[in-house]
Amino acid sequence: MAKQKIRIRLKAYDHRVIDQSAEKIVETAKRSGADVSGPIPLPTERSVYTVIRAVHKYKDSREQFEQRTHKRLIDIVNPTPKTVDALMGLNLPSGVDIEIKL
């Protein structure tokens, strides 16, 4: 019989929020009796935007802004129905994007 697995990907701009959310998910899954692998830190996406500071000229004066997207991966192996119910009832911060694959 094939092992069932739930794969959870988390994305957030703040690494502290994503680590707290990952810790909550791991703790909830372990409490319900499932085996947990993770949280695994994935590469951070970094997008840089360059803007000219002046309105008309002075192209040499520029300002750079960056946006970092932190990602984590959690695998829950052999989840029980109790695990799925506990994960559905979990409240996580609004700054965390969650993608769940069964």
Swiss-Prot record:
Any one GO molecular-function label of the UniProt entry: tRNA binding
Organism superkingdom: Bacteria
Keyword Ribonucleoprotein attributed: yes
TM stretches of this protein: none
Gene3D superfamilies recorded: Ribosomal protein S10 domain
GO cellular component: ribonucleoprotein complex; ribosome
Pfam short name (any one): Ribosomal_S10
Any one GO BP annotation for this protein: translation
Keywords: Ribonucleoprotein, Ribosomal protein
Matching InterPro entries: Ribosomal_uS10 (IPR001848), Ribosomal_uS10_CS (IPR018268), Ribosomal_uS10_dom (IPR027486), Ribosomal_uS10_dom_sf (IPR036838)
Keyword flag Lipid metabolism: no
NCBIfam families recorded: PRK00596.1 (NF001861), rpsJ_bact (TIGR01049)
Family, similarity comment: Belongs to the universal ribosomal protein uS10 family.
Function: Involved in the binding of tRNA to the ribosomes.
PANTHER family for this protein: 30S RIBOSOMAL PROTEIN S10 FAMILY MEMBER (PTHR11700)
Subunit structure: Part of the 30S ribosomal subunit.
Protein name: Small ribosomal subunit protein uS10
Organism listed in the record: Staphylococcus saprophyticus subsp. saprophyticus (strain ATCC 15305 / DSM 20229 / NCIMB 8711 / NCTC 7292 / S-41)
Gene symbol of the encoding locus: rpsJ
